[in-house]
């Protein structure tokens, strides 16, 4: 479409070739409105043409969602321009939507047309991003996506519980952090071998990671993953966190719009990481909680389910480039057996899929009768060139603030491409030195840290599960990871994702942060993830708040049932 502003008459007093700002804005607004009209027409054609296709209901729903997303972006641009016009003196304002703690949308008073526009109302961060004329459409998408993903976490960061300074602050049982061995880690990181500052540590590093750290990571993984042969440091790339590694892999293995299969429920941070830069879709392979003839245990992953998900994706025209596995699984805590892993790898090879395996919880197995089997322990892989392993220290060592993640891949091209992201996501030289010293002290890890960490995880898990049993709350009982997957369906009436969200908001209102199943792409509403790897006094207070919320919810359900009965 040509820009009408090119043909507008030039008012006297203005230089030829320049268009008044208000005319330019209205021209852009006209173009967007026409585009919006066209998109709405296509949207309703989709609705009409697919009404009778019951077998294509899912594709129908997804088509609607795509059109609604387009409409949302166009409306966003319109509001952007309208707000820009108001700020520059145009006689135009728009009532801005806001959302309360329950998620209900509120609108301001009707805009008034006047020569002196009313002051722009104070906006939340999310609203400000929505109307910020300085952001591109992509920038608005990123900002809104970030706010919607981390709004509650940011609230927690601003109002953290402290036993002396802030007893009414948020307690976070929603972010997977291990806070049980801070005393051990603080002591270890203050020892003399940690405090080294050399010239090379203050200079730009090898973007793949300092050679001394990559060598130590290769040795560490060879030892703890029980690799049959020594792992090659040249196959190691280190970045500032496992999500950075995953994001880099998504970028180099997929083009925008392509996809990975991921068994769901799965760690929600991967969805954020894959979308932020790479625009890669994660297609959930839904797992059911019910035991059936084909589902011999809850949330069982089978090759049949992978086959079905891949077929559905291809029928919808999606290009699937890989399979993502988390082992031990987050948030379920399941550990895949070597036989199961081999079946998943053979499935991937059959369809030329990459396999990304996140083993970030490999040392957080606290039941001595259970053995974790790393993919790196296998003598041969069906397709070693398409198998990529991620590990980091955030969970097993409880130092998420160090921001360290490592990739191990036999594929030299993948390693080289991921290394490019070290330019943006590298780790400071001093941190790399400390990490190297930490990982190479195998005696301290084996004799001091791991036994203590496993004992404390086991005791914290024992306390939490006893509390859940006393409350008669079902949960997925596993002995790895930092979390328990709990079933709160009985507190939802009806059992929907909207009711799940409202219960989540009730927890927030009582300064308790949990993670709800929807953020893990869980198929069934009512599941929550509860982190137990915290000090006992704080854990006990958190559980008191947890019980208070459930009592409030129970009373609210009784009132609702009575009101429904009276209406009948």
Curated annotation (Swiss-Prot):
Residues 1-21 are annotated as: Disordered. The keyword Nucleus does not apply. Keywords: Pyridoxal phosphate. GO terms for molecular function: pyridoxal phosphate binding; transaminase activity. The modification N6-(pyridoxal phosphate)lysine is found at residue 395. The keyword Hydrolase does not apply. GO terms for biological process: amino acid metabolic process; biosynthetic process. InterPro entries: Aminotransferase_I/II_large, Ethylene_sulfur-biosynth, PyrdxlP-dep_Trfase, PyrdxlP-dep_Trfase_major, PyrdxlP-dep_Trfase_small. It comes from the Eukaryota. Belongs to the class-I pyridoxal-phosphate-dependent aminotransferase family. This is Probable inactive 1-aminocyclopropane-1-carboxylate synthase-like protein 2. The gene is ACCSL.
């Amino acid at each position: 479409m040509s820009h009408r502003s090119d043909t507008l008459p030039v008012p006297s007093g203005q230089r030829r070739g320049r268009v008044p700002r208000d005319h330019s804005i209205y021209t852009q607004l006209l173009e967007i409105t026409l585009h919006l009209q066209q998109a709405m027409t296509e949207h309703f054609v989709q609705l009409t043409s697919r009404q009778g296709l019951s077998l294509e209901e899912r594709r129908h729903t997804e088509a609607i969602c795509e059109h609604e997303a387009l409409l949302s972006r166009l409306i966003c641009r319109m509001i952007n321009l309208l707000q820009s016009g108001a700020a520059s003196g145009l006689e135009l304002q728009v009532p801005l939507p806001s959302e309360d703690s329950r998620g209900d949308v509120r609108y301001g008073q009707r805009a008034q047309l006047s020569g002196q526009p009313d002051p722009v109302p104070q906006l939340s961060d999310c609203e400000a991003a929505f109307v910020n004329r300085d952001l591109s459409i992509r920038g608005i998408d990123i900002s809104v996506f970030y706010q919607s993903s981390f709004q509650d976490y940011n609230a927690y960061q601003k109002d953290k519980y402290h036993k002396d300074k802030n007893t009414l602050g948020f307690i976070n049982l929603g972010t997977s952090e291990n806070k049980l061995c801070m005393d051990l880690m603080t002591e270890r990181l203050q020892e003399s071998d940690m405090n080294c500052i050399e010239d090379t540590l203050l200079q730009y590093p090898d973007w793949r990671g300092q050679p001394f750290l990559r060598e130590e990571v290769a040795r560490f993984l060879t030892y703890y993953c029980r690799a049959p042969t020594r792992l090659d440091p040249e196959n190691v790339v280190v970045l500032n966190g496992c999500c950075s590694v995953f994001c880099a892999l998504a970028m180099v293995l997929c083009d925008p719009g392509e996809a990975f299969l991921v068994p769901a429920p799965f760690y929600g941070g991967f969805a954020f990481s894959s979308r932020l830069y790479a625009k890669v879709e994660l297609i959930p392979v839904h797992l059911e909680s019910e035991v059936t003839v084909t589902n011999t245990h809850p949330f069982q992953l089978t090759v049949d389910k992978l086959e079905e998900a891949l077929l559905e994706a291809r029928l919808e025209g999606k290009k699937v480039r890989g399979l993502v596995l988390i082992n031990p699984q987050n948030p379920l805590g399941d550990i895949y057996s070597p036989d199961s892993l081999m079946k998943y790898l053979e499935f991937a090879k059959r369809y030329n899929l990459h396999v990304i395996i996140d083993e970030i919880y490999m040392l957080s197995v606290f039941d001595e009768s259970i053995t974790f089997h790393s993919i790196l322990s296998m003598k041969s892989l069906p397709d070693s060139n398409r198998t990529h392993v991620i590990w980091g220290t955030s969970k097993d060592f409880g130092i998420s603030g160090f921001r360290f993640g490592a990739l191990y891949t036999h594929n030299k091209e993948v390693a080289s491409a991921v290394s490019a992201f070290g330019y943006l996501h590298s780790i400071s030289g001093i941190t790399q030195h400390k990490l190297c010293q930490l990982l190479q002290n195998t005696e301290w890890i084996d004799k001091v840290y791991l036994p203590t960490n496993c004992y404390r995880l086991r005791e914290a898990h024992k306390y939490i599960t006893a509390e859940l049993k006393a409350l008669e709350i079902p949960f997925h009982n596993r002995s790895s990871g930092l979390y328990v997957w709990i079933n709160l369906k009985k507190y939802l009436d009806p059992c929907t994702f909207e009711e799940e969200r409202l219960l989540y908001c009730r927890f927030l209102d009582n300064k308790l942060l949990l993670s709800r199943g929807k953020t893990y792409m869980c198929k069934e509403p009512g599941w929550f993830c509860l982190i137990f790897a915290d000090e006992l006094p704080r854990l006990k207070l958190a559980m008191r708040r947890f019980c208070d919320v459930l009592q409030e919810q129970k009373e609210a359900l009784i009132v609702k049932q009575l009101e429904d009965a009276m209406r009948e």
